[in-house]
Amino acid sequence: MKFALIGQDIPALIPTLLADLLFAGKQAADVWVEEKNQAMQDVLQRYGKAIIEKSGLAASLTADGDRAAVLSGADCVIYAGDCMAASRFRQDREALSGSGEDDPGLTDQARVNGGIEGLLHTLRQGEMVMTLCEAMQEHCPGALVINLGQPVARTTAIFEAQGFRCFGLGRTPLKGANGLDSLCKKLHTPERDVQATIAGLPGFAFLLGLKKDGADLLPKLHKLARKDELGRLTRRWLDWYEAIAIGDVTDHAEFLPAQEDYIPEEEPTFGESVEQRKERILHMNTVGDKGASDREGMMAQLLLLSKAPPIRPMQLALALLRGEGLTVDGVTRRNDGELPQLPKYAIIEARLTLQKGQVMPHGTQLPAPLVEICGEIDETNRLAAKAAMGDRSALRECIEIDPALSGLDRLYCQELVDRLIELHDDVITRL
């Protein structure tokens, strides 16, 4: 079994990827990491060698700058890349800021996944994903894709359109200011004791059911929301969509018209900070130098695992490749009956249940107002993905229908997007 790991966020995920592969999954495999920096190649390979020796399995980790070698014969590609996300976001935010009172700009459209900047993010990311897909079609045409690249709905749509079976993992709705853990605390109920139904779109998920020992807890939560105890945005969207927004509610706001009481984050986090990267490399070097069985190496490994992102792509990949059973919350994929009120080709986010590696749809029902807005956002997402693949007419249609642009002059938005595309013409080459 061969795994190809692609993207600048992969090194931060390596500790959990290897732990889930070798120790939880007990799977011998060849792991290839695309890494062009020779010093980082050495860090990753020494770290990987120490962890593999600890596992006792006949596995290998190779870091290489040659994409063809990394991809050749891969059974699964895990993608966690982006296109200079932080610096490009800052460029666009400045361009959207306007030039004075006569030109106030559209800074509320400087969003990571939705609105105008979400579209530009998609176009830049699309260049990277399309280039990867072209290489995969040559070197591993049957590979499974686990996609961690943002905006996850749109990058997943691109992989699917290029003929790859793709499952995405974004920020989990179980955590965050309005995550399931926080909502359960409001109800003074341990999260482990409840059965939750969470579904919607990537970054736009809602709590549709909450039970404990057969008792319905959702009415209590709705009551708290209507008392403004879960925040103004949560109450507003409960009134609009008849459901509780779950996860970071600011994620939901990215796909909706500007809200007076919501200001997009000026400096969103993209991957590791410089300090986090330095610390990770230090701990990886310790494991590589001391070994994973040495006390100092073990402590460094525990620190790496404790600070790794919460998503577990390797668990999902192994279940799909080995035809096993698994249940995972918040998985992005093609709908195919999971949410029967939305088209089968919609890119949705919901709990994934696998039986012998096959997806078992739950047939979850959404409130009617939520069906409508999810349909609009999904269509916008898929048009943005088509635009990222080089379809200029899809770009125009995306701007015409995007609910995040409601109330704005769509022609002005089109002109603004065209100017921003010119700003990034070194990386946006398909339009």
Predicted feature descriptions by range:
Residues S87-A161:
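Rossmann-fold NAD(P)-binding glycine/threonine-rich loop
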Residues I10, K36-M40, P173:
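Helix N-cap at the beta1-alpha1 junction of Rossmann-like dinucleotide-binding domains, i.e.
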Residues L144-K212:
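Rossmann-fold dinucleotide-binding core
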Residues M1-E34:
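N-terminal Rossmann-like dinucleotide-binding module
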Residues L22-S55:
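Glycine-rich phosphate-binding loop and adjoining beta1-alpha1-beta2 segment
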Residues S60-G73:
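Short acidic low-complexity segments
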Residues L183-L431:
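Long, compositionally biased stretches enriched for glycine and/or charged residues
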Residues L71-G81:
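N-terminal Rossmann-like NAD(P) cofactor-binding module of classical short-chain dehydrogenase/reductase
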